[in-house]
């Protein structure tokens, strides 16, 4: 697709040749014609990177015949819809920070990082509606962040001009987004993008790129892939991350070609040893790659004739969730191992995404990557001082604000996505039961993990003393508002999965206890158990409300909820909703009447 640029604020004396010469002098040669009008002109660039370079180099910076020219994307009003481009983003900015910033102005359907040779980052953002994109344009234009000023443009939204295929969701129908599909797509049409990320020695980066980029262009052309070499990340590092986007076959072929280039370069520079293949993989997927008692890894080693090692868990942090899988062997052997390793990682990733999407149907608008709860949804721009300086796996996975989830399950009067704009929500206490052997993983070394988790969630998290020497479960006491409960419980479920406390193919199911006023227990059960049965059918959680339980000193009884994370969360919220309704009725009606109505 051509990138049409608008050149404005031109003097009447400017000619097409003037513009060609100016662009040429700035090493921005124009291949096509210059369409010159009175006071403005249009030019085309076939490549988005060249278009960005022209905007950044010329707009507001270059004078021609006494006037400072303006350069931007040429987007007709008809195509100014949901898509914007943000430039001049600090290169070290973490995705979570950008998440939060973008989410303030609406539901973000997609963010894709543009692979440019500029020092700063560029992203293309798609909002759910035209109005949200317009607000983001107005609010973020010129936004200052650490001495960087954001530059924002509309980019064409092809969805507006193209006719809608029959299967496309109509305006107002959010089903395609809720299922994680691109707008207008189907589950078959959209393949999950799971890139291969590898580390290459810095001294081989030049050889992989080649003179004037010819080698890397040849790789991408032959394999139909996109290869991002993050050579500007973490200057001085011994290794640089490379991200390869393609089909599984294209990814493996591109990886093989890169391995061959590195080995050839090593041979020519008299480096004796074989160059290992180093694959970066999220810790949440690595357990399933290894397999029970290491069987999967041993099988790959045996079949490919390689030696495979995986970096220590101690290298991980909440901001650096990746581990390094080092494969040693011949180029052919390493390439074969890469195919098998990626097959396992991709399968684990797709299973996780399937589970997320199935449960997210219960929770409209939910996307976990916005909260960073589950491993496979987590994409970050690494901190500048990270151990590997690894950049994000682009294109950035679609994410939305979590306001859709909270607005559907939490009453609006409690809080919005930004609690400081509202009255403080009520503190809730949830007791979550985890396997005894998982306590160390939740606490972390010298309590580091549990403190980090409490800060992230904005909750108080304590592990109750064991009730006896041989108990199989321990109680985690979580105190905080609804959003904090969601984050804290989600991270605990995710941690248990990552650390292999449950079988790779097994869902993490935990028991949670919440206390409700004894006077509302009957309402939670419903007539003949109707309400609790409906609740279980809706949420897939097991909900147990003991009828003969003696209330505690606060006249409260315990409701037990057993299920996976989404099931448990939905059940907790629905039960709280019932309790809230009863409280409102008690405030509305005299005491005697309220109790009669609740029976």
Swiss-Prot record:
Residue span(s) of domain RRM: 3-76, 82-157
Region: Disordered, residue numbers: 157-188
InterPro entries linked to this entry: IGF2BP2_RRM1, KH_dom, KH_dom_type_1, KH_dom_type_1_sf, Nucleotide-bd_a/b_plait_sf, RBD_domain_sf, RRM_dom
KH domain boundaries: 193-258, 274-341, 427-492, 509-575
Tissue expr: Expressed in oocytes, granulosa cells of small and growing follicles, Leydig cells, spermatogonia and semen (at protein level). Expressed in testicular cancer (at protein level). Expressed weakly in heart, placenta, skeletal muscle, bone marrow, colon, kidney, salivary glands, testis and pancreas. Detected in fetal liver, fetal ovary, gonocytes and interstitial cells of the testis.
Range of residues in the leader sequence: none
Record keywords, A-Z: Acetylation, Cytoplasm, mRNA transport, Nucleus, Phosphoprotein, Repeat, RNA-binding, Translation regulation, Transport
Residues with the Phosphoserine modification: 11, 162, 164
Places the protein is found: Nucleus; Cytoplasm; Cytoplasm, P-body; Cytoplasm, Stress granule
Compositionally biased residues, Basic and acidic residues: 170-180
MF terms in GO: mRNA 3'-UTR binding; mRNA 5'-UTR binding; N6-methyladenosine-containing RNA reader activity; RNA binding; translation regulator activity
Gene Ontology BP terms: anatomical structure morphogenesis; cold-induced thermogenesis; CRD-mediated mRNA stabilization; energy homeostasis; mRNA transport; negative regulation of translation; nervous system development; regulation of cytokine production
In-chain residues carrying the UniProt-annotated modification Phosphothreonine: 550
Variant or mutagenesis effect after changing residue 211 to E: Significantly impaired binding to ACTB transcript but little effect on MYC transcript binding, accumulation in the nucleus and partial reduction in interaction with m6A-modified mRNA
GO cellular component terms listed in the entry, alphabetical order: cytoplasm; cytoplasmic stress granule; cytoskeleton; cytosol; nucleus; P-body
Additional facts recorded: Autoantibodies against IGF2BP2 are detected in sera from some patients with hepatocellular carcinoma.
Oligomeric form and interacting partners: Can form homooligomers and heterooligomers with IGF2BP1 and IGF2BP3 in an RNA-dependent manner. Interacts with HNRPD. Interacts with IGF2BP1. Interacts with ELAVL1, DHX9, HNRNPU, MATR3 and PABPC1. Interacts with the HOXB-AS3 peptide; the interaction increases MYC stability.
Role played: RNA-binding factor that recruits target transcripts to cytoplasmic protein-RNA complexes (mRNPs). This transcript 'caging' into mRNPs allows mRNA transport and transient storage. It also modulates the rate and location at which target transcripts encounter the translational apparatus and shields them from endonuclease attacks or microRNA-mediated degradation. Preferentially binds to N6-methyladenosine (m6A)-containing mRNAs and increases their stability. Binds to the 5'-UTR of the insulin-like growth factor 2 (IGF2) mRNAs. Binding is isoform-specific.
Free-text note regarding domains: Domains KH3 and KH4 are the major RNA-binding modules, although KH1 and KH2 may also contribute. The contribution to RNA-binding of individual KH domains may be target-specific. KH1 and KH2, and possibly KH3 and KH4, promote the formation of higher ordered protein-RNA complexes, which may be essential for IGF2BP1 cytoplasmic retention. KH domains are required for RNA-dependent homo- and heterooligomerization and for localization to stress granules.
Family recorded in the similarity comment: Belongs to the RRM IMP/VICKZ family.
Protein name per its UniProtKB record: Insulin-like growth factor 2 mRNA-binding protein 2
Organism: Homo sapiens
Organism lineage: Eukaryota, Metazoa, Chordata, Craniata, Vertebrata
Designated gene of the protein: IGF2BP2
